[in-house]
């Protein structure tokens, strides 16, 4: 609870919110822990696909990611409720100090009541996890839950070969080593090449267009780029197999 001066007037002019703001800072730091947890789950899930390791539904990485996404949403709602309450009290400056805990709980519950599965579409980590998992499964010819697996009996190398065009950077025309994906249009590039291109354009006060032929995205920013872990793994796996076959 916020501390107060020795004055007994109860005026909000004497309320110190430093304690609450310090606690908020700690909560925001915990959000980074949740983010790290989601990165770990994503990495393990991709490992399982790459090694084609079966796990029971009890230990599903999808379920773990959903739980992290729920924690992230709940924590975000609580932080928002506290910040909203502090701002409201500072603006209204009521004569009598309100029950801050009660106000926060009301705002928090109001936010929680609006929860829906659609919220996960706004969680960047969750969306990235689903996309990368889907892409890696596609590279290996694995369908979700192995249902309606029309690729059974099809040579895995052929499936990967069909996707090899995705391995080439549209800028360097070479196979990518550190592919990054454009969140806005979905195209991928070699990280060093696209970063250099964007920086060069921005230094000349020009907009950077997606170098993929036919793409309509004409204002690329560094913040649009995310590591394409699924594609990186697929490229590495393909190269390992190619090396084994040549030996």
Swiss-Prot record:
Its predominant location is: nucleus
Task: Kindly list the biological process annotations in GO that this record carries.
Answer: cell division; cellular senescence; double-strand break repair via homologous recombination; positive regulation of maintenance of mitotic sister chromatid cohesion; positive regulation of mitotic metaphase/anaphase transition; protein sumoylation; protein ubiquitination; telomere maintenance via recombination
Q: Provide GO CC annotations from the record.
A: chromosome, telomeric region; PML body; Smc5-Smc6 complex
Domain of life according to the entry: Eukaryota
Annotated GO MF terms: SUMO transferase activity; ubiquitin-protein transferase activity; zinc ion binding
Q: Where are the zinc fingers (SP-RING-type)?
A: 154-240
- Claim: Acetylation is one of the keywords in the record: yes
Protein localization: Nucleus; Chromosome, Telomere; Nucleus, PML body
Q: Where does Zn(2+) bind?
A: 185, 187, 210, 215
Crosslinked positions (Glycyl lysine isopeptide (Lys-Gly) (interchain with G-Cter in SUMO2)): 90, 107, 125, 130
Q: In which pathway does it act?
A: Protein modification; protein sumoylation
Q: Which residues carry this modification: Phosphoserine?
A: 116
Gene3D superfamilies in the cross-refs: Zinc/RING finger domain, C3HC4 (zinc finger)
Do you know which SMART domains this protein is assigned to?
A: Ubox (SM00504)
Top enzyme category: transferase
Its job:
E3 SUMO-protein ligase component of the SMC5-SMC6 complex, a complex involved in DNA double-strand break repair by homologous recombination. Is not be required for the stability of the complex. The complex may promote sister chromatid homologous recombination by recruiting the SMC1-SMC3 cohesin complex to double-strand breaks. Acts as an E3 ligase mediating SUMO attachment to various proteins such as SMC6L1 and TSNAX, the shelterin complex subunits TERF1, TERF2, TINF2 and TERF2IP, RAD51AP1, and maybe the cohesin components RAD21 and STAG2.
Family the UniProt entry places it in: Belongs to the NSE2 family.
Q: What assembly does the database describe for this protein?
A: Component of the SMC5-SMC6 complex which consists at least of SMC5, SMC6, NSMCE2, NSMCE1, NSMCE4A or EID3 and NSMCE3.
In terms of PANTHER family, this protein maps to: E3 SUMO-PROTEIN LIGASE NSE2
Protein known as? E3 SUMO-protein ligase NSE2
According to its UniProt entry, this protein's organism is Mus musculus
Q: Please state the gene responsible for encoding this protein.
A: Nsmce2
């Amino acid at each position: 609870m916020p501390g107060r001066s020795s004055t007994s007037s109860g005026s909000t002019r004497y309320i110190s919110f430093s304690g609450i703001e310090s606690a908020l800072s700690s909560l925001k730091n915990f959000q980074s822990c949740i983010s790290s947890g989601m990165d770990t789950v994503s990495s393990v899930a991709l490992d399982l696909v790459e090694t084609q390791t079966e796990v029971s539904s009890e230990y599903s990485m999808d379920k773990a990611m959903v739980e992290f996404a729920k924690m992230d949403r709940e924590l975000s709602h609580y932080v928002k409720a506290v910040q909203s309450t502090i701002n409201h009290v500072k603006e209204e400056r009521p004569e009598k100090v309100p029950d801050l805990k009660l106000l926060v709980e009301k705002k928090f519950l109001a936010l929680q009541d609006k929860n829906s599965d659609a919220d996960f579409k706004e969680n960047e980590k969750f969306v990235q996890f689903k996309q990368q998992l889907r892409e890696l499964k596609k590279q290996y010819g694995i369908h979700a839950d192995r249902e309606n697996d029309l690729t059974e009996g099809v040579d895995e190398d052929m499936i990967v070969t069909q996707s090899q065009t995705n391995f080439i950077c549209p800028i360097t025309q070479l196979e990518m080593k550190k592919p990054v994906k454009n969140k806005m249009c979905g195209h991928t590039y070699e990280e060093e090449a696209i970063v250099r291109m964007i920086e060069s354009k921005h230094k000349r006060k020009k907009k950077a267009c997606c170098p993929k032929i036919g793409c309509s995205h004409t204002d690329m920013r560094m913040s649009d780029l995310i590591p394409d872990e699924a594609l990186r793994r697929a490229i590495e796996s393909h190269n390992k197999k190619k090396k084994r076959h040549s030996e």
